[in-house]
Every structure is written in C-alpha cells, then in structure tokens.
C-alpha cells in the first residue's frame, strides 16, 4: 500500500514537473530539445541577453538552467 502511494505521488510529481518546465506553446515538448541544444552550444547567450534572474529572485523548482544568472535554482536563485 505504501509503495503504491509512493508511486502515485512520484507520477504526479513528474507530470507536474513536465507541465511546469514545458513551453507555453501548443506541442511545447515537441520543439524543446532543438532549443536546448542551441542553448548548450552557446551557453552565454541567455546571460548576455539579460534574461537571467539575479541571486535572491524567485525561480521555481530546483533545476540547473539559464533562468538564474548563476545557473542554480532552489525556490530562489542561488549565488555561485
């Protein structure tokens, strides 16, 4: 019973994670990987365009990415 509950919670969490990190467009996951490849190729691009958030700003779930200038987020942007 506990294992079943844990599996249900895990599936719900992963579903929410996918919906939160997906683009706002229709079929957002379809075009997600080419964009990620481009950002990996030019890793300084998001920072140079001013789209990153400074340390202390709210950023969402814990994830590495271009959303924070430092690249690390745990509810707020963490300093390096």
UniProtKB/Swiss-Prot annotation:
The keyword Hydrolase does not apply. Keywords: Disulfide bond, Hydroxylation, Knottin, Neurotoxin, Secreted, Signal, Toxin. It comes from the Eukaryota. The keyword 4Fe-4S does not apply. Residues 1-22 form the signal peptide. It is found in: Secreted. Transmembrane segments: none annotated. GO terms for molecular function: ion channel inhibitor activity; toxin activity. Residues 23-51 form a propeptide. One of its GO terms (cellular component) is extracellular region. The modification 4-hydroxyproline is found at residue 64. Disulfide bonds join 52-69, 59-73, 68-77. Expressed by the venom duct. Belongs to the conotoxin O1 superfamily. The presence of a 'disulfide through disulfide knot' structurally defines this protein as a knottin. The cysteine framework is VI/VII (C-C-CC-C-C). This is Conotoxin MaIr193. It comes from Conus marmoreus (Marble cone).
């Amino acid at each position: 019973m506990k294992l079943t509950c844990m599996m249900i919670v895990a599936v719900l969490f992963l579903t929410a994670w996918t919906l939160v990190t997906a683009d706002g467009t229709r079929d957002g996951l379809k075009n997600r990987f080419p964009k990620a490849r481009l950002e990996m190729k030019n890793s300084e691009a998001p920072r140079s365009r001013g789209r990153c958030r400074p340390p202390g700003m709210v950023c969402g779930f814990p994830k590495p990415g271009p959303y924070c200038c430092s690249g690390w987020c745990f509810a707020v942007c963490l300093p390096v």
